[in-house]
Amino acid sequence: MEGCRETEVTNGSNGGLEFNPMKEYMILSSGQQIAVAVLCTLMGLLSALENMAVLYIILSSRRLRRKPSYLFISSLAGADFLASVIFACNFVIFHVFHGVDSNAIFLLKIGSVTMTFTASVGSLLLTAVDRYLCLCYPPTYKALVTRGRALVALCVMWVLSALISYLPLMGWTCCPSPCSELFPLIPNDYLLGWLLFIAILFSGIIYTYGYVLWKAHRHVATLAEHQDRQVPGIARMRLDVRLAKTLGLVLAVLLICWFPALALMGHSLVTTLSDQVKEAFAFCSMLCLVNSMVNPIIYALRSGEIRSAAQHCLIGWKKYLQGLGPEGKEEGPRSSVTETEADVKTT
């Protein structure tokens, strides 16, 4: 793609004909536009509702919102909620309705999409680190991961995500650098830098969860040596198998949802893309929306404490609607440890 081109909302004139360079990126056929509109609308709505429900459950529970683990999960839900709304709306407006904005507005939109997805991956990394500390340092976990430190980590992560994502809006555009084959006004060197940053985040997630699984395996092996006659084999392997299933699911979802789009972004840096590849990238991009839709199930709905808080909320709303007031019973049994800590203790 050639260098800087003017894409202001007021189209230029070339021999009396309207000229809009943005149309070079609007390559979907009518059938593909319908598919994109339907898929983005349905997945965006479902993902937004799921993540909004998780946010409400955590923030409405005084017990949950005080725990660092659930602060990280609420950050993930917030990022995925914003990603669902911002990405779905802007993606449909651009590819289906061919909406064209001024350079600044367009860069603001694409920066917002980038920020929400970057913050989502950053929240996944903080959640992975939290689980690592919880499993590997259970006696000192509460002293290491306080609510204040969790909030500081989240603030740093969100500020860094915003700073990196809005660099094009602050002037890092393809003028005169070569423009990306996939994103208008975005230079290839910025795209390369963002890909490297995301690769670092994913490497941190994979390494952290891999180390957690290895540590759990050693923990189970140690128990087996000291309690071979007292602890049945199935019970000894319970933590190992449970963590392996959970971490396998986490990594499989990340790989399926993110790798196709990231691979095509990297491919665009070294070669010229055909329209067919660009069309494939448009649909691969929607897999990131699938990730935002699946995250609440993996990280929130599988948590016993969140399910208990959700049940309490439903009981409260039911009584409220029946005219009995919002007061209900106390939230489920109080626990001073997170789900991961409980797994370690039962093993």
From Swiss-Prot:
<feature type="glycosylation site" description="N-linked (GlcNAc...) asparagine">
    <location>
        <position position="11"/>
    </location>
</feature>
<keyword id="KW-0597">Phosphoprotein</keyword>
<keyword id="KW-0297">G-protein coupled receptor</keyword>
<keyword id="KW-1133">Transmembrane helix</keyword>
<feature type="topological domain" description="Extracellular">
    <location>
        <begin position="173"/>
        <end position="188"/>
    </location>
</feature>
<dbReference type="GO" id="GO:0005886">
    <property type="term" value="C:plasma membrane"/>
</dbReference>
<feature type="topological domain" description="Extracellular">
    <location>
        <begin position="1"/>
        <end position="33"/>
    </location>
</feature>
<feature type="topological domain" description="Cytoplasmic">
    <location>
        <begin position="60"/>
        <end position="71"/>
    </location>
</feature>
<feature type="topological domain" description="Extracellular">
    <location>
        <begin position="93"/>
        <end position="104"/>
    </location>
</feature>
<dbReference type="GO" id="GO:0099553">
    <property type="term" value="P:trans-synaptic signaling by endocannabinoid, modulating synaptic transmission"/>
</dbReference>
<dbReference type="GO" id="GO:0030595">
    <property type="term" value="P:leukocyte chemotaxis"/>
</dbReference>
<keyword id="KW-0807">Transducer</keyword>
<feature type="modified residue" description="Phosphoserine">
    <location>
        <position position="335"/>
    </location>
</feature>
<dbReference type="GO" id="GO:0043204">
    <property type="term" value="C:perikaryon"/>
</dbReference>
<feature type="modified residue" description="Phosphothreonine">
    <location>
        <position position="338"/>
    </location>
</feature>
<feature type="topological domain" description="Cytoplasmic">
    <location>
        <begin position="302"/>
        <end position="347"/>
    </location>
</feature>
<dbReference type="InterPro" id="IPR002230">
    <property type="entry name" value="Cnbnoid_rcpt"/>
</dbReference>
<feature type="transmembrane region" description="Helical; Name=3">
    <location>
        <begin position="105"/>
        <end position="129"/>
    </location>
</feature>
<keyword id="KW-0966">Cell projection</keyword>
<dbReference type="GO" id="GO:0045202">
    <property type="term" value="C:synapse"/>
</dbReference>
<dbReference type="GO" id="GO:0030425">
    <property type="term" value="C:dendrite"/>
</dbReference>
<dbReference type="GO" id="GO:0006954">
    <property type="term" value="P:inflammatory response"/>
</dbReference>
<keyword id="KW-0812">Transmembrane</keyword>
<feature type="topological domain" description="Cytoplasmic">
    <location>
        <begin position="130"/>
        <end position="149"/>
    </location>
</feature>
<feature type="modified residue" description="Phosphoserine">
    <location>
        <position position="336"/>
    </location>
</feature>
<keyword id="KW-0472">Membrane</keyword>
<feature type="transmembrane region" description="Helical; Name=4">
    <location>
        <begin position="150"/>
        <end position="172"/>
    </location>
</feature>
<feature type="transmembrane region" description="Helical; Name=1">
    <location>
        <begin position="34"/>
        <end position="59"/>
    </location>
</feature>
<keyword id="KW-0395">Inflammatory response</keyword>
<feature type="transmembrane region" description="Helical; Name=6">
    <location>
        <begin position="247"/>
        <end position="267"/>
    </location>
</feature>
<feature type="transmembrane region" description="Helical; Name=2">
    <location>
        <begin position="72"/>
        <end position="92"/>
    </location>
</feature>
<feature type="region of interest" description="Disordered">
    <location>
        <begin position="326"/>
        <end position="347"/>
    </location>
</feature>
<dbReference type="InterPro" id="IPR001551">
    <property type="entry name" value="Canbinoid_rcpt_2"/>
</dbReference>
<keyword id="KW-1003">Cell membrane</keyword>
<comment type="similarity">
    <text>Belongs to the G-protein coupled receptor 1 family.</text>
</comment>
<feature type="transmembrane region" description="Helical; Name=7">
    <location>
        <begin position="280"/>
        <end position="301"/>
    </location>
</feature>
<dbReference type="GO" id="GO:0004949">
    <property type="term" value="F:cannabinoid receptor activity"/>
</dbReference>
<comment type="function">
    <text>Heterotrimeric G protein-coupled receptor for endocannabinoid 2-arachidonoylglycerol mediating inhibition of adenylate cyclase. May function in inflammatory response, nociceptive transmission and bone homeostasis.</text>
</comment>
<protein>
    <recommendedName>
        <fullName>Cannabinoid receptor 2</fullName>
    </recommendedName>
</protein>
<feature type="topological domain" description="Extracellular">
    <location>
        <begin position="268"/>
        <end position="279"/>
    </location>
</feature>
<keyword id="KW-0675">Receptor</keyword>
<dbReference type="InterPro" id="IPR017452">
    <property type="entry name" value="GPCR_Rhodpsn_7TM"/>
</dbReference>
